[in-house]
């Protein structure tokens, strides 16, 4: 087994496939012999032969009697497929069904079919899907990046898309290394500023924040929270900020609420990264005997179905279907060669505050 836990032949196959897709091994380039590859990678000829067999079966390489093995031009027929790939962190819940619906309606009306992929916010899955989509052939890509605040180690795959003039649109996040690429984003800092200001204007002064550390939305929403505190001359206290990651998002928020109760340092307001986190926080508050909003006011983000149930959650609008439509229209512009200065698609979506019972008494 390789160090990453994969069979050695499979690890070699993946490495060579990445080299082909990134252009490190070019179409028509002759590959080293089995013996040479065996020496280079420190593997048996049998292992090398097995890896080459998979690459040949997938169309990445081709052998000619008496001449050797060559890199195939797997991207030669990549355009004109009629397929647009849509890669999001999740598909079946929260805001994603309506977002995807918006994309599909616009693309279907223009004769395209969509290929859906769900990364689960995994970088490894994102890279694997990109390799697969590039090799199968797509006309364009709409993608929500996974863990967009973490260094992207598969930039070469996006460079391959650029090389073969396959347009792609980022939605809801953007890798630091690719800030200039086409995108549709929410004004996340502005939205978080609005909910924090709402709590401050309602008389709350001891306000905690729960934010996601591994994506752009979390970082931007934290910025909005800080800005509102500064404008109201309230000192920023890092001890009142809870940072969580994709892996601990289902456990850490509730755990930190319990810790606040035990330490007797309870806030009178909590700004949450999104509506899902707000629900977790509110459920734990109630288990700890706290009343909402009398003891603690809570806000969310995204105006999802979660925010419209029960007493309701004060939140920020998310256009969902409209965002999908905007991304699809921008991609169609790119496919048609419309210059950026002539684009009719808005790139930044302005936030709107929706006040509900989680932050103010409604009288119901």
Show which residues each predicted segment covers.
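Flexible loop/turn connectors
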Residues: 14-15, 254-364
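Short, solvent-exposed amphipathic alpha-helices that sit
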Residues: 94-109, 191, 217-236, 280, ...
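An alpha-beta-alpha
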Residues: 193-234, 341-359
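Short acidic capping loops at alpha-helix termini that bridge into adjacent secondary structure
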Residues: 27-29, 206, 236-240, 292-297
């Amino acid at each position: 087994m390789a160090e990453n836990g994969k069979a050695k032949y499979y690890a070699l196959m993946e490495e060579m496939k990445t080299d082909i897709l990134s252009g490190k091994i070019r179409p028509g380039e002759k590959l080293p012999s089995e013996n040479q590859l065996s020496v280079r990678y420190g593997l048996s000829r049998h292992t090398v032969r097995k890896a080459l067999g998979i690459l040949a079966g997938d169309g990445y390489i081709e052998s000619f009697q008496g001449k050797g093995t060559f890199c195939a031009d797997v991207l030669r027929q990549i355009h004109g497929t009629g397929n647009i790939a849509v890669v999001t962190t999740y598909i079946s819940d929260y805001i994603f069904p309506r977002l995807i619906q918006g994309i599909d309606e616009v693309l279907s009306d223009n004769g395209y079919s969509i290929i859906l992929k769900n990364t689960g916010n995994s970088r490894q899955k994102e890279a694997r899907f990109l390799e697969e989509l590039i090799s199968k052939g797509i006309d364009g890509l709409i993608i929500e990046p996974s863990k967009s605040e973490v260094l992207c180690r598969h930039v070469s795959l996006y460079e391959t898309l650029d090389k073969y003039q396959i347009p792609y649109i980022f939605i809801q996040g953007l890798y630091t290394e690719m800030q200039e690429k086409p995108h549709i984003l929410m004004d996340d800092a502005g939205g978080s500023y609005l909910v924090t200001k709402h709590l401050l204007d309602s008389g709350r002064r001891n306000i905690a924040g729960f934010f996601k550390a591994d994506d752009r939305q979390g970082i931007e929403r934290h910025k909005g929270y800080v800005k509102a505190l500064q404008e109201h001359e309230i000192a920023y206290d890092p001890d009142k900020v809870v940072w969580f990651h994709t892996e601990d998002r289902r456990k850490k928020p509730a755990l930190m609420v319990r810790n606040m109760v035990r330490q007797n340092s309870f806030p009178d307001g909590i700004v949450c990264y999104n509506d899902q986190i707000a629900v977790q926080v509110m459920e734990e508050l109630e288990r700890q005997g706290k009343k909402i909003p009398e003891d603690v006011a809570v806000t969310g983000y995204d105006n999802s179905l979660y925010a419209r149930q029960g007493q309701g959650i004060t939140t920020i609008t998310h256009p969902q279907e409209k965002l999908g439509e905007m991304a699809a229209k921008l991609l169609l512009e790119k496919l048609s060669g419309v210059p950026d200065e002539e684009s009719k698609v808005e790139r930044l979506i302005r936030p709107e505050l929706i006040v509900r019972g989680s932050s103010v008494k409604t009288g119901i």
